[in-house]
Amino acid sequence: NNQEIIDKSSIIILGVTPNVGSTILRKLKFSKNKKIISLISTINLDKLKKLTKNKNIVRATPLPPIEIKKGPIVICPPNKGAKNLFKYLGEVVEIKNEKLSNKFWATASIMAAYYEILNVSSNWLIKKGINKTTANNYISELFLSLSQDAVNKKSQGFTKLVADSQTPKGLNMQVLNELTKSKFYFKFIKAMDNINKRVSS
């Protein structure tokens, strides 16, 4: 019983999907002393305050890797209680401006697309005769090493990593050029723009 859980809790985390969020919240009652953390991507703070009749609301974007205590967790607006709750699960990023925080929702939406790149790469190896376990191990280790290298060198900027990872007429340059010509990165940016519009509406 959602209402019973709310009544017995001091902190309520809203984790329902956006398409049913408004319907469910309208049926529930939140006392003004309750602290609310919303994980609902497309319901903004103003609407949340109207739906819950509560002003003590924070939006947060924890991603699945918090299971292994990794990854960024965006909190808007900054809130000490929410930060203390999430700081053990990942790297907390506090944003004052909700419009700016929506940009982080947009970039967080690339998760499935990222995993699909791993999936396509591994399946390509498998179709070429590589054992599935070997292919999955190789691809996961490859992307792990690239991600760790990016973390270690983030102060240099990612443009430098792009430049440093290719040689004139080399294999990496060829793949980058082919993807660029196919407008892969343009479509990637367009997709994030579309998500930004969706979460900002």
Predicted segments, located by residue:
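Small-residue helix-packing motif on alpha-helices
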Residues: 5, 21, 131-139, 161, ...
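Residues at or immediately preceding the N-termini of alpha-helices
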Residues: 2-3, 79, 132, 158, ...
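Transmembrane alpha-helical core positions of polytopic small-molecule transporters
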Residues: 15, 111-115, 168-169
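Internal alpha-helical scaffold of NAD(P)-dependent oxidoreductase catalytic cores
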Residues: 47-56, 71-153, 194-199
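Rossmann-like NAD(P)(H) cofactor-binding subdomain of soluble oxidoreductases
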Residues: 1-75, 79-81
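NAD(P)-dependent Rossmann-like dehydrogenase/reductase catalytic/cofactor-binding core
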Residues: 140, 144-201
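Structured helix-beta-strand junction loops
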Residues: 8, 31, 88-89, 168
